[in-house]
A protein has these predicted regions:
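Extracytoplasmic ligand/sensor domains, especially the bilobed periplasmic-binding protein
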Residues: 62, 76-181, 229-254
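Immediate post-signal peptide segment of exported/extracytoplasmic ligand-binding proteins
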Residues: 1-13, 41-50, 141-147
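Short, surface-exposed alpha-helical segments at coil->helix boundaries
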Residues: 26-33, 134, 159-167, 267, ...
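Beta-alpha junction/loop-to-helix N-cap segments that form part of ligand/metal-binding clefts
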Residues: 10, 23-30, 42-115, 183-190, ...
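Extracellular/periplasmic periplasmic-binding protein-like sensory domains
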Residues: 127, 218-285
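Extracytoplasmic "Venus flytrap"
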Residues: 1-33, 55-62, 84-85, 152-160, ...
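Sec-exported extracytoplasmic/periplasmic mature domains
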Residues: 33, 37-44, 69-77, 93-101, ...
């Protein structure tokens, strides 16, 4: 298999280091590099050191394909690790799989990350966005006593997964979306979408959004006096949301697939890891 020699295993990772998820992409790159350094300090994997190469997609599927072509054909990676973005991952599959390159633990909860075809080369860890929205939406709607559930979603494979999950979840409690509205990937103005949901009288909004767009949607809503309950997925929330969005983000709910490493309340193993991260990079994870 390519990417494996007697002394080294070459891995690749495509992150968003210049687009709407750049802050998160930087954290992901540093976190993965920290773990690779730990493994190498302990002698590697079966005596082989890990060599992790990063490329930047800017959260653009076309750039992701170019990055994958470089990593697969030039750098000869054994596996793609932690590639971020649903559409970006799907776009790179035709580059990876003909060369038997594994797609390992992508940073997306799309079902395409583990379903056929080529499922033997797909290793996913996240609860699917569809199931996050399908289970989380009816539970929180009932808990909040919401009467008009609505959705704003990114107009791509990721956003549609969240939308479908929300719709199917609401069916289980005899409801349907009162309104839905979408935005193009990379958008920064959400005034028309917020106005549409406000006019519909939505008191509950499912967010098929990523980090920057989560902040933008909620900030615009607060500015116009629109204050429904907001529910996002794992893609909608990291601690960057409240760090960058401030008090306006109070009251946001999100489904999570892993424990967020808050230093003051995480489990002991996570606190241990988080403190190592802070020591190495001089910032909270």
């Amino acid at each position: 298999s390519q990417g494996v020699s007697k002394s080294e295993i070459t891995l690749g990772s495509i992150q968003d280091l210049s687009g709407p998820l750049a802050g998160f992409g930087k954290q992901l790159r540093m976190g993965m590099q920290l773990r690779v350094d730990e493994v190498n300090e302990q002698g590697g994997v079966n005596g082989r050191k890990l060599n992790l190469k990063f490329e930047d997609s800017g959260y653009d599927p076309k750039r992701a394909v170019l990055a994958a072509q470089k990593l697969v054909n030039q750098d000869k990676i054994f596996a793609m690790v932690g590639h971020i973005g649903t559409a970006a991952n799907v776009a790179t599959f035709p580059v990876l799989f003909p060369k038997n390159v594994i797609n390992f633990y992508p940073l997306t909860g799309a079902r395409e990350m583990f379903e056929q075809p080529n499922q033997r080369l797909k290793y996913a860890f996240s609860v699917p966005y569809y199931d996050q929205a399908r289970t989380g939406t009816p539970r929180l709607v009932k808990e909040k006593g919401a009467k008009k559930a609505c959705a704003i979603y990114q107009d791509d494979e990721f956003g549609l997964e969240v939308l479908r999950g929300a719709e199917d979840g609401l069916k289980t409690i005899g409801m349907e979306l009162a309104e839905k509205t979408s935005y193009k990937r990379g958008a920064t103005d959400f005034s028309s979408q917020v106005a549409k949901m406000k006019a519909a009288g939505c008191d509950f909004v499912v967010l098929g959004t990523v980090i920057r767009e989560t902040i933008g949607t909620i900030a615009e809503s607060r500015k116009t006096g629109f204050s429904p309950t907001f529910l996002g997925t794992t893609a909608a929330y990291t601690d960057l949301v409240h760090k960058l969005g401030g008090k306006a983000m109070d009251g946001l709910y999100a489904t999570m697939a892993v424990q967020v490493p808050y230093l003051d309340e995480a489990s002991q193993p996570i606190r241990f890891w988080a403190n190592k991260y802070k020591t190495k990079f001089n910032e909270d994870p």
